[in-house]
Amino acid sequence: MALCLGRGILVAPEVTNAHLLVNFLNGMGVPLQRYLCDLDVTGNLSAGRDVEQLLPDRYELDQRVIRFVSIEQANLNAWRVRLCEVFDNGAPGFIDVYEFEALDPDHPFGTEWTFDSVDGALRFARDVLRTSQGRYVNQGLIQDEYKDRYHPEW
């Protein structure tokens, strides 16, 4: 399954550094489809490709905490939901939320739950972590979500 970027531009799912490609095409004025439809979310997860979603921020000790959910295939019959909470350490030219300081140093990669189905993982993310349908992105695009929501001036 290819990722449709608009104007008939298709990108193979094997493309790495998707956020670099998206930024390049966006700079060329190519309209991009950032958010995945429900079918793409379940299809990606069933095929072993991760999806992510930026959640509303919160504050801890007067510092903004960036929150995002990642859903990934843990093994052949299990899917992992991960809640990542990191301090907003971003700066112009540094928007890699994966590298930001973790809120909880004992869980640098977030808190994880495992489910035996894609539907179970998505239902938990929706009901407990308050994700929204239609707001999932492919892995690697969460940085763009972060920049656009919290620091559009960069």
Indicate residue ranges for each PLM-predicted region.
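Negatively charged, low-complexity tracts enriched in Asp/Glu with abundant Ser/Thr
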Residues: 2-66
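Acidic, proline/glycine-rich low-complexity IDRs
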Residues: 2-4, 104-154
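Long, C-terminal folded domains that constitute the functional core of proteins
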Residues: 24-25, 55, 95-97, 149-154
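Intrinsically disordered, low-complexity boundary segments flanking structured domains
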Residues: 55-58, 67-70, 99-102, 122-123
